[in-house]
Structures are given as structure tokens and as C-alpha cells.
Amino acid sequence: MPLTPNDIHNKTFTKSFRGYDEDEVNEFLAQVRKDYEIVLRKKTELEAKVNELDERIGHFANIEETLNKSILVAQEAAEDVKRNSQKEAKLIVREAEKNADRIINESLSKSRKIAMEIEELKKQSKVFRTRFQMLIEAQLDLLKNDDWDHLLEYEVDAVFEEKE
């Protein structure tokens, strides 16, 4: 059991023939008692401060643990977001590729259709040209016909005179 200031104060020594001066010993013990009380008081204060600091350390340890957990949760959430973003990006790329293929196929189909229409128009223009040429040639033949000369010889006045 540790020594207390009262133990120091109440300590008695046996007297011997050539012993110490009693007043001097009592003064020294009184001084030791005062110093010991100061040391004990400081010890108590320091223990209280240590307890307070231990509580604060515990509090900060809890905060640290909470922050570490929060960081882990945030990292996991970030990884989830990253994974989901990558999946979504792949889906978008896949969808874009499908759309591109569809657009290309539609364009090829339209270009084939237009090419077929062009060929059909070429055929129709050849037919039209041939028919038009035949019409013009027929008209030229009519113009070259001698019947026109006969019409020019026909006199209109003579027709009116006959009717009168």
C-alpha cells in the first residue's frame, strides 16, 4: 500500500542515544509531507487529465473508425458507379453499333433501290427517245410528203366562188 501524507506526519521514530535532532526531523517530515501532498495532488490531476485524454482518444478513435468505414463505403460506391458506368458505356456503344449497322443497311437498301430506279429511268428514257424519234421522223415524212404541195396549190377563193 502506498505511503500517504498522514503516514509521513504520524510516523514516529524510536529515540536512541546518539539520534537525530527531533525538531529537525519533524521539520523535514513536515516539508516531505507538504511536498508529497503536492506530488499526490499533481498525480491526481494528471490521472484526471490522462482519463480525459483517454476519453478524447477514444472519441477520436471512434471518429477515425467511422471515417474509415465512410471512406470504404465511398470507395465501394465509387467502384459501383464506375462499374455501372462502364456497363452503361458498353451498352451505349453496342446500341450505337446496332444503329450504325441499321443505318448502313438502310442506306445500302436505298442506294440499291435508287440504282434500280435509275436503270428503269434509263430504259424509259431510251423508249421515250425511240418513240419521240419515231414521231419526229413520222412528222418529217409527213412534211416531205407531196400532199403539202397540193395544199399550197389549192385556192381558197375558188372554194368560196363555187359555193356562191
From Swiss-Prot:
GO MF annotations in UniProt: identical protein binding
Single GO biological process annotation from the record: sporulation resulting in formation of a cellular spore
- Disrupted-gene phenotype: Misplacement of the septum during cell division, resulting in the formation of small, circular, anucleate minicells.
Give a Gene Ontology cellular component term annotated to this protein.
cytoplasm
> Where does this one sit in the cell?
Cytoplasm
> What is the protein's quaternary organization?
Oligomers. Interacts with FtsZ, MinD, MinJ and Spo0J. The association with Spo0J is transient and occurs at a specific point during development.
* Coiled-coil boundaries: 29-107
Please report which protein family the annotation says this sequence is part of: Belongs to the DivIVA family.
- Recount the UniProt induction comment for this entry: Constitutively expressed.
Q: What is this protein called?
A: Septum site-determining protein DivIVA
Task: Quote any Pfam family the record assigns.
Answer: DivIVA
Annotated effect of mutating residue 18 to A/C: Localization at cytoplasmic foci instead of the cell pole. Stable interaction with Spo0J and association with the chromosome
**Organism annotation:** Bacillus subtilis (strain 168)
Q: Which UniProt keywords apply?
A: Cell cycle, Cell division, Coiled coil, Cytoplasm, Septation, Sporulation
Function, as annotated, reads: May act as a pilot protein, directing MinCD to the polar septation sites or by inhibiting MinCD at the midcell site of division. Required for polar localization of the chromosome during sporulation.
InterPro entries in the cross-refs: DivIVA_domain (IPR019933), DivIVA_fam (IPR007793)
Q: Other remarks on record?
A: Overexpression of DivIVA is lethal.
